[in-house]
Amino acid sequence: MEEHIQIFDTTLRDGEQTPGVNFTFDERLKIAKQLEKWGVDVLEAGFPASSTGSFKSVEAIAKTLTTTAVCGLARCKKSDIDAVYEATKEAVKPQVHVFIATSPIHLEHKLKMTQDEVLTSIKEHVSYAKQFFEVVQFSPEDATRTEIPFLIECVQTAINAGATIINIPDTVGFSYPTEYGEIFKQLTQAVKSNSKIIFSAHCHDDLGMAVANSLAAIEGGARRIEGTVNGIGERAGNASLEEVALALYVRKDHYGLESQINLEETKKTSDLISRYAGIRVPRNKAIVGQNAFSHESGIHQDGVLKHRETYEIMTPQLVGVNTTELPLGKLSGKHAFAEKLKALGYEIKLEDQVTLFKQFKEIADKKKNVSDRDIHAIIHGSEHEHNAIFQLDNLQLQYVSKGLQSAVVVIKERNGQVKQDSSIGTGSIVAIYNAVDRIFKKDAELIDYRIDSVTEGTDAQAEVHVRIIINHIEVTGIGIDHDILKASCKAYIDAHAKYISEYELKEGIRT
């Protein structure tokens, strides 16, 4: 195979460390399938030893994917490595990612180990991992704050023990492009190996240089880039993989190497992660933001109309942004709807299409044109409600007095059982959320509430995102409906359901 830049996606592991992001089991599977469709080389599916839930997710992903390598994270602990092996053993290409911190501040304050003890641990655990895995990746955590001589010693020890991939994490986003690229040059020149070693870059965005550092690493000899979709991750996030992939494509004249990313799946992948994570993509976000291909200046508009390349270095179609969609309407039939689903890349069973078509007709009766974004919302909303353990069955609101509202909420469980309660509050939303809290017998704190319109216009569907805290645990919820209050109620129920399914029904799973 011709040499290319490997894309190592850690959206489901490092990306899920974003505050408030808790993907469900089903969401992780759907994300994994879409990432494979997008064309990532390796998917870091999770940290199997951290919890039973994480183990089961990694195991399910390993059994599901057909072309993408599945990797699990492990500390320098044999039990961690054993967990990765058990979780990924049915993957088509299993990999393990072993790490230990190497910087002075981590050795002194976190590990309380000497440099010699760290070297011994690297040798012991990388060689142990090599007994089970053909591909072993080693990461010296906080590498960019590690003295270069010791970093070289750690890397050489890992290679001697059997590591085939060396990842250099800029764990706290401390480095800058010139410095980071130079680290790779020094390492590739200093280490010795009888077999091919792939160097990998893992950058955080604390100083806003994660993508620039990743590209500098390629110039320094890296052939694998790690990151997340939309750059999600703890603190300021990780390197945005869609930006890396497009930079390699657009500037192949400079880098000379491309990724194997299916660029046309980029926007769809970004939208999926945004919806499940509950994190809106900024309008001015490179590649996938709403303004990425917009031109406000009259001079720019005139130039683009005369010749697109005057102000655009890539086309919207390249990343899967459809600018020539033909909207459906209330007169559109089942065949036209089925063809639209197919054109949008969905493979949906005929019996499921019947339900979706009914929802489409309900929306078409309320608005003149049903756009592609409406169709996406119908499908994702339907999938979300189908997999939900609780659904909104009925909502009634009534004005009481002095600004107080009364809300009656009826919720149906998956087993058919119905729960109902009522409450009052200073406004409709407060009343609704108080009633839901009473149903679930939870004292939840609402910390974020956001309404997005699925499309433009007064007849748009509302997509509500909420973040709540229950028992010091932060969870998110999504609700879609033409009625903003119903969408708000659905989102709040969804957040409660996520907490219950992840932290109560599976009590003891997470650590």
From Swiss-Prot:
Provide the alphabetized UniProt keywords. Answer: Amino-acid biosynthesis, Branched-chain amino acid biosynthesis, Cytoplasm, Leucine biosynthesis, Manganese, Metal-binding, Transferase
Primary site of residence:
cytoplasm
What biological-process GO terms show up in the record? L-leucine biosynthetic process
Q: What is this protein called?
A: 2-isopropylmalate synthase
What interactions and quaternary structure are annotated? Homodimer.
Which cofactors must be present for this protein to function? Mn(2+)
Give the span(s) annotated as Regulatory domain. 391-511
Q: Which residues form the Pyruvate carboxyltransferase domain?
A: 5-267
User: Any idea which positions bind Mn(2+)?
Assistant: D14, H202, H204, N238
Instruction: Give the protein's biological function.
Output: Catalyzes the condensation of the acetyl group of acetyl-CoA with 3-methyl-2-oxobutanoate (2-ketoisovalerate) to form 3-carboxy-3-hydroxy-4-methylpentanoate (2-isopropylmalate).
Q: Which GO terms describe its cellular component?
A: cytoplasm
Signal peptide limits: none
